[in-house]
Amino acid sequence: MEEEDESRGKTEESGEDRGDGPPDRDPALSPSAFILRAIQQAVGSSLQGDLPNDKDGARCRGLRWRRCCRSPRSEPRSQESGAADTATVLDTAADSFLVELVSILDPPDTWVPSRLDLQPGESEDMLELVAEVRIGDRDPMPLPVPSLFPRLRAWRTGKTVSPQSHASRPACSRHLTLGTGDGGPAPPPAPSSASSSPSPSPSSSSPSPPPPPPPPPPPALPAPRFDIYDPFHPTDEAYSPPPAPEQKYDPFEPTGSNPSSSAGTPSPEEEEEEEEEEEEEGLSQSISRISETLAGIYDDNSLSQDFPGDDSPRREPPPPQTLGAPGTPPQADSTRAEGAPRRRVFVLGPEAEACHEGKVSVEVVTAGAPALSLPPLPPTDPEIEEGEIVQPEEEPRVAVSLFRAARPRQPPASVATLASVAAPAAPPASAPRAPEGDDFLSLHADSDGEGALQVDLGEPPAPPAADARWGGLDLRRKILTQRRERYRQRSASPGPPPARKKARRERQRSGDPAPPDSPSWEAKKHRSRERKLGSHSTARRRSRSRSRRRSRSRSADRRRGGHRSRSREKRRRRRRSASPPPAASSSSSSRRERHRGKRREGGKKKKKRSRSRAEKRSGDLEKLPASVPPSGSDRDSRRRGAVPPSIQDLTDHDLFAIKRTITVGRPDKAEPRAPSPAPAVSPKREVLYDSEGLSADERGGKSDKDRRRSGAASSSSSSREKGSRRKALDGDRGRDRDRSSKKTRPPKDSTPGSGPLPKAPPSSGSSSSSSSCSSRKVKLQSKVAVLIREGVSSTTPAKDSSSSGLGSIGVKFSRDRESRSPFLKPDERAPAEVAKVAPGSNKPKKTKAKAKAGAKKAKGTKGKTKPSKTRKKVRSGGSSTASGGPGSLKKSKADSCSQAASAKGTEETSWSGEERTTKAPSTPPPKVAPPPPALTPDSQTVDSSCKTPEVSFLPEEASEDTGVRVGAEEEEEEEEEEEEEEEQQPATTTATSTAAAAPSTAPSAGSTAGDSGAEDGPAARISQLPTLPPPMPWNLPAGVDCTTSGVLALTALLFKMEEANLASRAKAQELIQATNQILSHRKPSSTLGVTPAPVPTSLGLPPGPSSYLLPGSLPIGGCGSTPPTPTGLAPASDKREGSSSSEGRGDTDKYLKKLHTQERAVEEVKLAIKPYYQKKDITKEEYKDILRKAVHKICHSKSGEINPVKVSNLVRAYVQRYRYFRKHGRKPGDPPGPPRPPKEPGPPDKGGPGLPLPPL
């Protein structure tokens, strides 16, 4: 991270020094001269200074060329590109532009072909060409040649030379880094690039070594980078020929630089030729070409170049822009990226011109160095495309759409070759996408049918032309274009300042929407975008970009290991801590934090570790490195979460991982396009890979469901889901929340039966809840509901996504409730939470949406969360997160068991409402009314691994599966947040706990939950709150259905309630104690599925504890007798007390564990008994007795294990015994407890203390 930061800083400095900052630009220099100089210097320095430049070296895993190009319109802050790349790129891409640049820059001095030649595949890392063109003032780009040259030369000379780096960093926003997107072999400085390539790549773009050759070394390894092949982006093929300067680079100079360096250091002559051509054509043309090239490069390269090992906050902005303009550049980049995820991010956009000072930033990111994201242009284009990973509000990077006009420039044959190579190896999307490079405006992290994540760079203009290309290859672009169209349709009303995040996201996603706030665009617009409903298109684009980035980040994370996760975690924490301070900002930052938290959770769930690392790393990088380019404060603000980490967190690694793992069904994508106008439904096609059943219907309606399911069909790539989901969560959270809550929420409620909404997955962060049915936990392992939506309208993360079923992959990221609450409160509360609003407007929980509380938590749009009914067992993980909330989700402690798979969505909803409302622990009005219906724990085995006692089991009485415990355990940070929210929903929690305690009527639910849990278990959090069929809203006073409330309440409640609603808990304790006294003697205590209604749900918060409070024998749900009165739901500060007071179960964790064990035991016993019961070997009464006794025995076994074999043996012994008794006229019920079953003591070896046996 530091390395990335340094590189970034250096990049900024180089940009500023070279360009003297946007203000300091040399008026004397003509724009073309400026750009040429910048490019030349960048290339030269990149060649010599890739590794030499310490920061840039960090940036350039391999050599990285930085060119500072200033065009009248765009002033490339610093263009880093391998010499070969630059030459090739310049020659291929922007002949005139390059020629101008070359002429201005001293080609011989700047270009150091020797470096490239040095170690074509080894030293020099693959470089990713990231170009950021800021267009604003075209005129003097005071990129002082002298300053540029010295820096470039210094950089070339020594990898630690900071001059260029420094210049680049100050000018971070404007620096153009042309790197060999190809990640050609790092030049001799490769050591530095190598070191950074593994994980530093502070500057995602700079990390790309200026590899004159474009070897596709493995992203992590400078030389290996080109060895590492990106399955989705056959960069290897393109990269394999490192010496193909002209081939690598396409008509667009920025992109060409990347491929060129990969192909081989373009000779200065080539660059000069390009410069000449550029001068002839003029800066605008050159810029358009660059943008086109960038778009082309980005199309495939960016996606393909996910630096698994690179933390490239900087890179984050660029990676999304992977549209291949002609397809070659992206492919070339992609080709190189294959080996080493290399991101070429070119942000060139006339649209952003107004807001941007004329700046062209071309960043070449090494596969291993994602850190160097393009420095955001603070005032730059309002429409930061999704394609570009936009820095948070602080350093909005212009994801300006590359000039579509530049499109005429087709990649040269060599570039085309690269594209073709990349396309074959990579999903077809790569090659076809290239032609649409001009549309790279919005880069969405879409995955091709082949599973390659690709960024759509095309705007609406591109779709017709792109359609042919889109057929197999440009799906992303096509989707992106449609998104843009939708966004434009809706963008007119994007949004109020609250939409700041959204606005930013939208800008990133679609260059069009955010022009107005371009200056404050960084922070405010991002937030507004996040919130804006209208900015669905941009949200989608951003989601895509995010998912891609995230995917890459994940990939890198896997390669890098925990490094990224650690840094990301730190950054997230920083964000969390930082975001609260500003008041207005605090809500948006809270939202951001929430999203980040969710993302964090999502990362853990999806990649379990690798994703979590990627997320953390991405978040960190995006937070720190991403903001580094603009300034330290920018970085800090990013950390704070000025922009939801959705994009920020998506590093190249993440995107790469997403690209690799997430496959979006093209047909689905194409289909959703038609609905593109529909902001809520149409914009998103949510393909929740993990949670196919993720209430797509609920979220987007039944069509959504179908789409989602189709998406689920393609959801085989859970990795993608992870990345996409993260992105979607981040970017879509606000929009999706708003839109889903408002627009789709009613549909969701209307279609509670539909599978759980993706919302659950976001909340679960693992999208485990996304599975509409337990059967639908298709990709639960990824634990992330990847919403594949054409439009990533953040406001309608799940619902819209499902409705539109558009091809874009919106990744819903679980965020902390804090960050989510701003979104959740208004939309979710108002729309589908009327009933819940009564309990507390602040914690209005969408009845059905709340059922998806997990998703809501993750997504911040609980309303969006699948309805409780829909969500039943959707995704164990997702559902659980409802209560866990973003933080809870993150906790995948209970997640491992994913008992929450069938957790009630309603519970989730209640949670989400509180989450939204009560950010601060303000014991909100406890949701006194506990779910009266006794919910059987459904053998939703609470994860024993649950760290937090938040895991709640919500046996839904209606659906056997639905009552899966939501072991949504949030990380402690998030737990605190959750607890705060729980204060608001103490009653809900109680209800949920009660439901959990309620006899687990549906062992199958438990089983499904268990399955989900298996997938989710690895997930960071237990977002396993599947919405239970009961769509009962979490009305605080009314009391939520035990089924829905149990899971969520237990999850969030156990921890949050404990801390936030102690008073409520005390009351709950009293109630539980009373119930305990009554029921503690009854072994079928909490799992008495028979008594679903009388659950002491009155303790909204205590429910979780109450379940646990039961000494294990007291069934919370079972004690249906306990009135659902808001007993002590009022925040009695004894929440914790309640749990501890109940039979010394002071430890909520213990209770949760016991409940979990008991539920699992019930599930196992039911499974074992079923055959006998079906054969009528035993009667119903005997069945109940055996179930109760067996569960009791298992729970009290010394081993504490639940061994299915032992359980079956025990059950068989009981059945035989009962049969024997029946034969001999003795009553089977006579023997108290398991009457001498063969394996009495350890039959199931359920170590759970005498949990109340839930007799069925």
Swiss-Prot record:
Keywords: Isopeptide bond, mRNA processing, mRNA splicing, Nucleus, Phosphoprotein, Repeat, RNA-binding, Ubl conjugation. Residues 7-27, 227-236, 612-623, 696-709, 719-741, 813-831, 1133-1152 have a biased composition (Basic and acidic residues). Residues 478-489, 538-553, 560-577, 592-611, 843-875 have a biased composition (Basic residues). GO terms for biological process: mRNA processing; RNA splicing; transcription by RNA polymerase II. It is found in: Nucleus. One of its GO terms (cellular component) is nucleus. The keyword Kinase does not apply. May function in pre-mRNA splicing. This is Splicing factor, arginine/serine-rich 19. It comes from Mus musculus.
